Every structure is written in C-alpha cells, then in structure tokens.
C-alpha cells in the first residue's frame, strides 16, 4: 500500500504543481518517485518497529523529495493536505496535519550509523554539540546554536550526503 500511496502523491504533485516561469524547477519525473523508495531503503529493516514507523519513514521521504522543492507556503500547505489525504485513504492512519511536518530521519543520532527516526530537538542537541566539539578540535572553531530549523536542515543535508 505504501507504493500505491507514493504513486498517488506523485500523481497529485505532477498535476497540481506545474512549472511556471517563477517555478521552473517544479519539473518532476519518475526518477523522483524512485528517490522516495531509495530513501526508504536507506533504513535498515531491524530499525523498523511497526506500521506507524514505516509510515513515518514514507512521510519523511515524500516530504524530502517533493515538498522541499516547493517555494511558497501555499504550495507547501497544499502538499501537506494532499499527503494527509493519501495517508488516510491508502494507509488507514489519521494523524493531525502538524504531526507530518515534524518527522525527520537521519543517521547522526546513533552510534551504529543507522538511518532512523530522529528524536526531538532537545534529545538531539547534546549529540550535535558533541559532534560540533569534535569538529572544532580538528578545524577552525564554529559556534553554532542548534534550534529546531537548524536541526531539520542538518537532517536534510545529512540525508543528501548519505545518498
């Protein structure tokens, strides 16, 4: 059912978010759909605990592949609503819309390097500060504050680099 949901959201994206001169990068093809599956395959099966965990992984990957390309709030909100509808229809799960935006996966929150669901910003902050301290020992020191948006962007960057 997850593949059917991914195909459904892909269909909605290519039909609703058409390229315009201001949004010429809204050009998608089947390779983008395969990136959703590729992102899901980065997660080790030992880490996937249940159906809800798998759906969160699916949500994260569709958001990274499709939603992160959208440049205005109206388009991002429409994508979130479409995703919510697809999740309800295909995967029989009813979540509140704000819960969708806070799902993030990465490989820097555990010692094994598994791609898995990240904790909250408060959970990640000590780990990120340790990684920053290690970096600062070897390079020119950086002084970073790990607020919520920063952690979300770090997760996105780490995902890109992992691929």
Residue map of PLM features:
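Alpha-helical lid/collar subdomain of P-loop NTPases
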Residues: 1-162
């Amino acid at each position: 059912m997850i593949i059917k949901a991914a195909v459904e959201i892909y269909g909605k994206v290519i039909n609703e978010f058409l390229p315009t001169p201001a949004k010429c990068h809204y050009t998608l093809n089947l390779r983008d759909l395969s990136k959703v599956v590729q992102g899901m395959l980065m997660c080790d099966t030992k880490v996937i605990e249940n159906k809800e965990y798998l759906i969160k992984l699916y949500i994260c990957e569709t958001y990274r592949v499709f939603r992160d390309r959208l440049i205005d709030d109206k388009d991002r909100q429409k994508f979130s609503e479409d995703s919510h509808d697809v999740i309800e229809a295909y995967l029989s799960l009813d979540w509140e819309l704000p819960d969708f935006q806070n799902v993030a996966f990465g490989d820097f929150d555990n010692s094994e390097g598994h791609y898995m669901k990240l904790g909250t910003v408060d959970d990640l902050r000590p780990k990120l500060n340790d990684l920053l301290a290690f970096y600062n020992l070897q390079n020119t020191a950086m002084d970073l504050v790990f607020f919520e948006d920063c952690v979300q962007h770090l997760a996105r960057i780490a995902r890109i680099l992992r691929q």
